[in-house]
Amino acid sequence: MSENLSIDLSESELRDLLDTEAARINSPAFIADDPVQFPRRFTSLPDVEIAALLASTIAWGNRRMICRDCDRMLALLDNQPLAYTLDQGYEDLPDCNIHRTFFAANLRHYLRGLRRIYLRHGSLADFALAEKIHLSPAPAWALAQAINRELCLLYTSPSPRDCS
C-alpha cells in the first residue's frame, strides 16, 4: 500500500528545515560516518570528482558497509583516483566484489569511461559544460546519461546515436 505524504510548509519553515539539516549534515560527526567523506579526502578537482562518483555509485545499503567498501575501493586505486584511471591501473584489478552487486568488472568498465572523459575534457566539470548539462531541468540525470553514453561509446561503433 502506498500513501502520499503531503507536508505544507511556509517558505520560512522550509528554509529553517533546510538550514537545520544542512548544519547537521555538514558537521564533522556526520561526515565521519557518511560516504560524503571520501571526496573530501582529496584536493584536486578530478580526484574529488572521481571519488564522489565512485562513492555515490555504491552508496546504497548500510552506511557503515558503504564507507568500508568505498575505503577499500579507493585503496584499490592507490588513493589516487585520477592517476590510477589515466594510467589504466584498473586493467590489473583482481576479480573481486567491491560492494554488494558492484564488482571489479563494473569498476573497470566505469573507469574506462571516466578515462575517456578525462583525456578529452580534463575534468568532469568541463565535460558537463561541453555536454550543456547546466541547461537541463534535471542536471543530475543529464550528467548520468552523458556519462553512460561515454561508457557505451567504448564498446559500440563511433555513432553516438547507438548510445542514446
Walk through the language-model features, giving the residues of each:
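Non-catalytic, well-ordered alpha-helical scaffold segments
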Residues: 48-52, 67, 105-112, 141, ...
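Hydrophobic/aromatic-rich structural module bridging two neighboring secondary-structure elements via a short loop
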Residues: 79-119
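Amphipathic alpha-helical interaction segments
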Residues: 61-65, 77-84, 121, 125
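Structural motif
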Residues: 40-49, 100-106, 138
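Hydrophobic, well-structured mid-protein blocks that either form specific transmembrane helices
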Residues: 124-151
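Single conserved hydrophobic/aromatic residue that forms the stacking wall/gate
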Residues: 155-164
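Charge-rich, intrinsically disordered N-terminal extensions
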Residues: 2-58, 64-67, 71-74, 78
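Long, acidic, intrinsically disordered low-complexity segments
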Residues: 2-15, 119-134
